[in-house]
């Protein structure tokens, strides 16, 4: 379980990114967070593995505080958290296989991983992960030779090879076309269902949130304004999440597509 206890985040310029967040996400859930740009979705997501440090409160993972973790303990906890970024976050000039093997870095010494000395068991894990997302034939291609959708599937394979217990996906389909968007979200959903990996995804699309989520969390101005099952996420609730009544009809048109 991931638990946020009275979590707040204030940026150096005084902007409040998160305001007293209290939230529990159970093991194996597939949660989608929605809201306007700047609502706090990315800040909340990235605070889980401390890419963003919180100002107040505490974040617990399986009853252990990642907020208080240091050194080896922090590295161990981060090893269980796979991150998928909008920009893919791949080493473009490296092969797909090497990018997937980056998911194994947390299991070995810095010297060993710098030299690329991964054991054959790790290489086999990487191949299995690539096969899982239907991109095994690209193992020895350079990452920058791949389409955007293929690169994002490499990111998913990296998280699988990492043997992550939690996957955090920050706007993973923002730059992808509709067909590729479906492929990437289908992959994430299937992995969640087959392996029980707790998955949190940030999205802008109301329609996609309704299609894929089992639970939707809506953020507005750094606060949770909705938290419930898909069935409870009515058009009116989405209008509240997005906060502008004048845009309500536009939002509902998007949701209907």
Swiss-Prot record:
GO cellular component labels: plasma membrane
Listed EC numbers: 7.3.2.2
Any one GO molecular function term: ATP binding
Upper classification of the organism: Bacteria, Bacillati, Bacillota, Bacilli, Bacillales
Similarity comment text for this entry: Belongs to the ABC transporter superfamily. Phosphonates importer (TC 3.A.1.9.1) family.
Protein name: Phosphonates import ATP-binding protein PhnC
Chain ranges of the ABC transporter domain: 2-246
Keywords, comma-separated and alphabetical: ATP-binding, Cell membrane, Membrane, Nucleotide-binding, Phosphonate transport, Translocase, Transport
């Amino acid at each position: 379980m991931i638990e946020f206890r009275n979590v707040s985040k204030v940026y150096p310029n005084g902007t409040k990114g998160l305001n007293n967040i209290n939230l529990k996400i159970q093991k194996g859930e597939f949660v989608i967070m929605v809201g306007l740009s700047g609502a706090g979705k990315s800040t909340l997501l990235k605070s889980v593995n401390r890419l963003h440090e919180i100002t107040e409160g505490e974040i617990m993972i399986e009853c252990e505080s990642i907020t208080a973790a240091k050194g080896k303990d922090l590295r161990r906890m981060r090893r269980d958290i796979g991150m998928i970024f909008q920009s893919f976050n791949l080493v473009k000039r490296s092969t797909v296989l090497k990018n997937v093997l980056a998911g194994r870095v947390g299991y070995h010494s810095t010297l060993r991983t710098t030299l690329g000395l991964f054991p054959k068991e790790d290489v086999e894990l990487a191949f299995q992960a690539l096969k899982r997302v239907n991109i095994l034939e690209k193992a020895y291609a350079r990452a920058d030779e791949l389409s955007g959708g293929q690169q994002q599937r490499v990111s998913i394979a990296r998280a699988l090879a990492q043997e992550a217990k939690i996957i955090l996906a920050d706007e993973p389909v923002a730059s992808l076309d509709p067909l590729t968007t479906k492929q990437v979200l289908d992959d994430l959903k299937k992995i969640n269902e087959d392996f029980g990996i707790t998955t949190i995804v940030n999205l802008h699309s109301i329609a996609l949130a309704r299609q894929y989520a089992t639970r939707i969390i809506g953020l507005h101005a750094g606060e949770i304004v909705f938290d419930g099952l898909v069935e409870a996420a009515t058009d009116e609730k989405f209008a509240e999440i997005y906060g502008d009544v004048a845009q309500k009809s536009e939002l509902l048109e998007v949701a209907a597509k």
